[in-house]
A protein has these predicted regions:
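Short, acidic, Ser/Thr-enriched surface-loop or helix-capping motifs
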Residues: 3-4
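Flexible mid-to-C-terminal extensions adjoining Fe-S/redox cofactors in radical SAM and related proteins
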Residues: 14-125
């Protein structure tokens, strides 16, 4: 969770998209904006916890969420489309995915213990 200098409530300091502003909404209203609700509903973004980020490792999810929720770019210096932002991460994601999957598949894992966990077929690695 991040609030930028303009008051826009963003899901992450690196992801400059929002649909609510703390100067116009309460904190709870900001957290209930469609973008944050979509974040909650789509977690985990990947069953491989070495690939958790919706921007770096799962950019197709961030692109879909931003489009579906109508979130707008809040970058005060250089606004950009979500496609442009995510395109910068593809090379990294493509190189990291096989390594992360290998490491993840070779290690043991605890069962998910948090209450809102919903297994999703599309997120399987």
């Amino acid at each position: 969770f991040h609030i930028n200098a303009n008051g826009d409530a963003e899901p992450c300091v690196f992801i400059h998209y929002s649909g609510a502003n703390i100067r116009e909404n309460t904190l709870l209203e900001c957290l209930k904006q469609p973008l944050f609700m979509a974040y909650r509903d789509n977690q985990p973004f990947n069953n491989n916890q070495l690939r958790p980020c919706p921007m770096l490792e799962n950019s197709e999810i961030l692109q879909r969420i931003v489009k579906e929720t109508g979130a707008k770019s809040t970058d005060l210096q250089s606004p950009e489309t979500v496609e442009h932002l995510c395109a910068k991460c593809h090379e990294y994601a493509d190189k990291w995915a096989p390594e992360a999957d290998k490491l993840w598949n070779e290690s043991t894992h605890m069962e998910h213990a948090y209450e809102n966990y919903k297994p999703k077929e599309q997120n399987k690695c």
